[in-house]
Regions:
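Alpha/beta-hydrolase fold nucleophile elbow
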Residues: 123-134
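The serine-hydrolase catalytic nucleophile loop
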Residues: 67-80
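Active-site nucleophile loop of the alpha/beta-hydrolase fold
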Residues: 155-165
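Conserved alpha/beta-hydrolase
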Residues: 82-98
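Alpha/beta-hydrolase active-site loop
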Residues: 101-121
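C-terminal catalytic histidine-bearing segment of alpha/beta-hydrolase fold enzymes
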Residues: 226-263
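The feature captures the conserved acid-bearing segment of alpha/beta-hydrolase catalytic domains
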Residues: 179-222
Length: 263
């Protein structure tokens, strides 16, 4: 009964976390970057490595975006990382008609396989930053432990504090509670995963886009963990706007690859 209801609700939940589409928005060349597709198994997805020509790699970034089939839409928002001398790995998971349950289940499973593939490409001596947006932040949380001593830092942008609180904030006590119970009963909440990470600096960032209530961000801000810090971006500022918050994040990332200590 639970599974059949879950399959029904998955149609409603799909748009909460994912915006699948096949449109090509940007090419690496548009951003002045080199792009290389990594070979993967046919049922896993697509991995694209972005690099800045003639710049020696100082580290790598695995970027978990919040959709599927729209990898190229995220090239402009990650290109600045390449300017810092970082190799950026973007990926799309491959959806299948055979996928069952809620979208998050197949997302986590397939994301794990692609992260394994990406880590095979990164030299053991090179540091890796995990960065995720919305449900991509959960993917980053689930996979950062795979990098072990390579993990330089973790950035969680517009990350739900818990599945239940996110659903309740958006849908009220009735439907929200039912959906949260079915959606993520087999997964730990983001705040639980954050509390288990001890030796990796974490930056939780937030910008009000109407998708995630600020109450989720404020709950993280009340969390007293020594490796946790926060940046709130102005609500109306475009994604590529250079402001003091963006400069602060840039400096944090540079420090991630200089030292393992937090500010």
């Amino acid at each position: 009964m639970k599974k059949s209801f879950a399959n029904y609700l998955s149609v409603l939940v799909e748009d909460l976390f994912f915006s699948p589409e096949d449109q090509v928005y940007w090419s690496p060349e548009h951003a002045g970057l080199n792009g290389q597709k990594l070979p993967t198994l046919s049922d896993e997805g697509t991995v694209l490595r972005l690099t800045k020509p003639n710049i020696e790699a100082k580290g790598s970034v695995i970027y978990f975006h919040d959709g599927s089939k729209n990898l190229t839409a995220h090239i402009p928002e990650t290109a600045w990382l390449c300017e810092l001398g970082l190799e950026v790995y973007l990926f799309d998971i491959l959806e299948s008609e055979d996928d069952k349950g809620f979208p998050i289940e197949s997302y986590i499973r397939k994301t794990g396989k692609l992260v394994d593939r990406i880590l095979q490409e990164i030299p053991q001596e090179q540091k890796v930053l995990f960065s995720g947006n919305f449900i991509g932040a959960y993917g980053a949380l689930e996979n950062v432990s795979k990098a072990s001593e390579q993990a330089a830092g973790l950035i969680l942008h517009n990350c739900p504090y818990s599945f239940r609180s996110y659903m309740l904030a958006n849908y009220g006590p009735g439907l929200g509670q039912a959906m949260s119970a079915l959606l993520a009963s087999d997964y730990q909440d983001p705040y639980v995963l954050v509390s288990e990470i001890k030796n990796v600096p974490i930056v939780v960032t937030y910008q009000n886009t109407g998708r995630l209530p600020i109450s989720e961000f404020n709950k993280f801000r009340k969390t007293e963990l020594p490796n946790l810090s926060y940046i709130e971006f102005p609500a109306k500022a475009p994604a590529q706007t250079v402001n003091k918050e963006a400069e602060e994040l840039r400096e944090r990332i540079i420090k991630f690859f200089d030292t393992r200590t937090t500010s």
